[in-house]
Structures are given as C-alpha cells and as structure tokens.
Amino acid sequence: MTKENICIVFGGKSAEHDVSILTAQNVLNAIDKERYQVDIIYITNDGEWKKKDNITQEIKNTDELVINDVETGEISQLLSKGSLGKSYDAVFPLLHGPNGEDGTIQGLFEVLDIPYVGNGVLAASSSMDKLVMKQLFEHRGLPQLPYISFLRSEYEKYENNIIKLVNDKLTYPVFVKPANLGSSVGISKCNNEEELKSGIAEAFQFDRKLVIEQGINAREIEVAVLGNDYPETTWPGEVVKDVAFYDYKSKYKDGKIRLDIPADLDQDVQMTLRNMALEAFKATDCSGLVRADFFVTDDNQIYINETNAMPGFTAYSMYPNLWKNMGLSYPDLIAKLIDLAKERYEDKKKNKYKIDY
C-alpha cells in the first residue's frame, strides 16, 4: 500500500508554543506510520520554519522536536505542491493560539491550495476571538453567562469607568481573559477590585482585547465534535479540579485535574449538551474538530463557555479521551481527521473560480 504523505506543523510564535510541541509529540506517537509517511515542520518562537522528513521513531521527549540543526526554509518551498516541494495529501497544523489557531495559518494553506486538518479561516478566527465567538453564540440563541469586553487603549483612557462597569454589571468572582489565547494563558480569577486590576494588567500582556466573564459555581463539562457538514458528538466528559480554577499550570504542569468520562449527568442533560455542541459547531461554521465547553449548575442550568477549534492531544486532554470512550482510538481519530481534511478539499474543488460569459 502506498503511504499518504502528511506534514505535521507545530511550535509557533505564540505563548502556547510549548503546548503545541507537547501536542505534536502525542500525535506523532499515535499516528499510523504504516499508513502515513510523516514529515514535520517546527516553527520557532521567532517564526522560523525548520523541517525534517520521514519521522519514524517514537518521540520520547519534547526536546527531540525542537529542531535547531537545519537551515530555516522558505515556506512555499517547504509546503507547496509544485516543483518546489513534495506533494502532501494533507497538512496537520497542531498550532495553538495566535499565528496558528486563529485562521492565519489556515489562510496560508488556502493560498497554497493544500488540504489541511481542522477548521477553515472563518471558523478558526472566530473561535479564537472570545468576543466574536460569544456574539455568534448569542445570535444562535445559546445561553451564556454575562460578560463585558474592552480594548487596551480603551482601558488606558477610561480605566475608572470600565472598573465601575464591571462592578455594576458583574459580581465577584469574575474571570479576566485575553480574547485571543487558549490553554488558560493569561487568565485570572478575581475576587475583588484589587485582584481585578491586577488580572487586567496580566491579561493585557498577552492581548489588546479582554473579556471579563461572570464567575459561577458550576461543573465544567466538555463535548467533542468531529465531522464536516454532518458532524458527530461524544457523550460529555467532566473536568474535575483540585485547584481554584483550571489554569495553564494545572492543565500542563501539576496534573491537578481529573477527567471523568462519561460525566455523571442525567440522560436528558447529556443529550441537551450534545445538541448545543452541534449548534455551537454550526454557529462558527466549523469543520473537522471542535471541543465545546459548558458550565452545568446543580439545578442543571446549562451555559456555553467556548469552543476550542484545535483542542490539545496531550495525555491530559479531553478531546481524544472523549473519542476513545466512544470506541475511536488515537490512530483512528487521527486518520479520520485526515480523511475529513481531504473530503473538505475535494468539496471545495466543486466551486467555480471564473465566470462564463
């Protein structure tokens, strides 16, 4: 059997650089190398692209993926399908955060006319920006917690007014979040005005736009979605924390979380969550994969929190474990995602790009 040529892209110029490398390690160790020939492209923190061909060995340490011993390559040469480079059946971007999960890299693949795993430009960019995402959810009629949003320039000019708005509209605790980051980078739980100001200063180090959300005493429930025009969902899973909130350190450093799969919820609540996950998927025009995150209160009130257009594949990650519970193994999940990328690419080829006069 002729192997399909796959290129995995990871790293990136983002605060989530290390998370991306960890995700790449998991995917590289899970992908079926009898079916796929796998090349990798590592993007450094400075934005340089480094490529290695035909990865066959197990990656035992993430340091093995930090490529420093090859020359920086031209992007078009590394990826193009013409005479400048190898023809790839699909590219698998495992980039988290800005410059990778926000539609920018997807736009590059579109221009180069290469099939790629995951969401397109619109879905990736709207899922990355928490404010845009919330506005799309609101238009779809999905229930959300109260929030406000503002820019760094607005806060510098109207700090007192914005603090007053938070105090008037929301009640403590609140969560301060950069609008365009994931993996809980830059997020703070604030219990009073002093902590609020500190949290705002922290979050503005990572983004020019913030979202401040109402805190709630609720369970954190997640649903995985897989597919293109006819997506499927998993039974929900629950993030059980031994910390105040599910931040970057507890996710990737301390291991102070547990994933309960499936979550202990009434059947009707589980079905509602699955249906809402599909609605969120459609609201942002997603394709390939999404993880939809929810809050569920003790009286079974459900609020959508966000969708993650490129959920992690680390040992702690919910997305692959939710599909494992449904009977879909890591290798089969990866193969399915690659097939979905090719399916979407073939569908796009049906579009006309010139007008017949």
UniProtKB/Swiss-Prot annotation:
Localisation per UniProt entry: Cytoplasm
Residue positions binding Mg(2+) 1: D293, E306
Cofactor note: Binds 2 magnesium or manganese ions per subunit.
InterPro entries, per database record: ATP-grasp, ATP_grasp_subdomain_1, D-Ala_lig_Van_CS, D_ala_D_ala, Dala_Dala_lig_C, Dala_Dala_lig_N, PreATP-grasp_dom_sf
Any GO molecular function: ATP binding
Keyword Manganese: yes
Residues at which ATP binds: 167-222
Single GO cellular component term: cytosol
EC id: 6.3.2.4
SUPFAM superfamilies, per the entry: Glutathione synthetase ATP-binding domain-like (SSF56059), PreATP-grasp domain (SSF52440)
GO BP of this protein: cell wall organization; peptidoglycan biosynthetic process; regulation of cell shape
Cofactor(s) required for function per UniProt: Mg(2+); Mn(2+)
Domain ATP-grasp residue range list: 134-339
HAMAP family from the UniProt entry: Dala_Dala_lig (MF_00047)
Protein name as it appears in the record: D-alanine--D-alanine ligase
Organism (species): Staphylococcus epidermidis (strain ATCC 35984 / DSM 28319 / BCRC 17069 / CCUG 31568 / BM 3577 / RP62A)
